[in-house]
Amino acid sequence: MKIVYIYHSFILKGGIERVFCDKMNYLAQNTSYDVTFITFEQGNHPFAYKLNDRIKVVDINCRFAELWNYNIIKRNILNFILRRKLKKCLTATLKKESPDIVISTTEDIKYNYCIFNLPYRFIVESHVHMKEIIKSSIKKQFFIHSISKIFFKWKLSKINKCKLLVALTDADKRDWSKVINSDIIIIPNILTFYPDKITDYSKRSKRILCVGRLTKQKGFDLMIKVWAKIADKHKDWKVDIYGDGDLRDTLNELINNYGLNDSITLHSSTSNIYNEHMDSSIFAFSSRFEGFGLVLIEAMSCGVPCISFDCPHGPSEIITNGKNGLLVQNGNIDEFANSLDSMINNYEQRKFMSINARIDSQKYKRENIMPQWIELFETLSKTMRI
């Protein structure tokens, strides 16, 4: 069987990139499938995550990100040209590869919609919850509201042409079922690595770990405000934030304004994040919204109790409140601060949640999730082409 994954690039380190890479690597290492990865903005950039040597990589030279270097008129002209090129090249590449199944994401629909009329079995993965896609697609400004609304409906029509949509959470499945007619199933993200041994919880540093891109979505500005409310009570505790992104200067300024330079540190992203988990006592998740929350299960696999905003979607389906972590009302900084304060003060509660977090994260291990994908592929391969 030949499986083709399509994604714009693996230049940046992120959850989608990590999961796509892990799934392709698993299939290449553990099945007889031929796996091909098609990108269109990778160019000569190194891959953020290492791909198995059995995976065939094809890059189609369509650099949409570079269009922002031009004025709006030239940008739109070049955008039209690039989209025609992408359609032609994707069509030719798929014809050459002749895949049994093609997999893409809801985020890339705006680019690769042009191939959904081709006679292949298409699967679309939803890595950003549906309501956020609506919010980002339909602008508030009156003069472009109608146009963006039409664009969103057009986008849904393209998703409807796919054989199947795979959601990461039950909540996201319910949301998608209201707006598309395609079949929808749930397969959660896989846990990249489940350590055989972890550091004894009693020997860990008094630090709170946060991980993610430095963007508004990840809510690190909220986390800084949370810590500002209780930092004076816990002078022997530190907050370490790992990630890269455009908001680094803004977040550093916020840290400075609150006088938290001695207790909050922004670090660049690291390829050894599990080492950081092993030396952390709490994992704080401050996202405004998520598709799943991969970093939560990574922390839990290392026995780190988590505290999270109950944002849409993911945390409430991963964290059982009071058992393996704590959930607080989405965006409620005071409640988050109070819950974090209580968590810090109650070592026995943290140790109890640490044990349960490690146990509960096992269901996301590759050997438990990937058979669901293989079963799906085998089932679809027995159906007639669209």
Name the predicted role of every residue range.
Residues 5-13, 26, 30-77, 175-177, ...:
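N-terminal strand-loop element at the rim of the active site
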Residues 14-22, 206-229, 246-253, 334:
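A conserved mid-protein helix/loop that constitutes part of the nucleotide-sugar donor-binding site
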Residues 88-92, 145-165, 179:
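Membrane-proximal helix-turn-helix segments that form the acceptor-binding/catalytic region
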Residues 269, 288:
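Aromatic "clamp/platform" in nucleotide-sugar-dependent glycosyltransferases that forms part
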Residues 320-322, 326-333, 341-347, 362:
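Conserved acidic donor-binding segment of nucleotide-sugar-dependent glycosyltransferases
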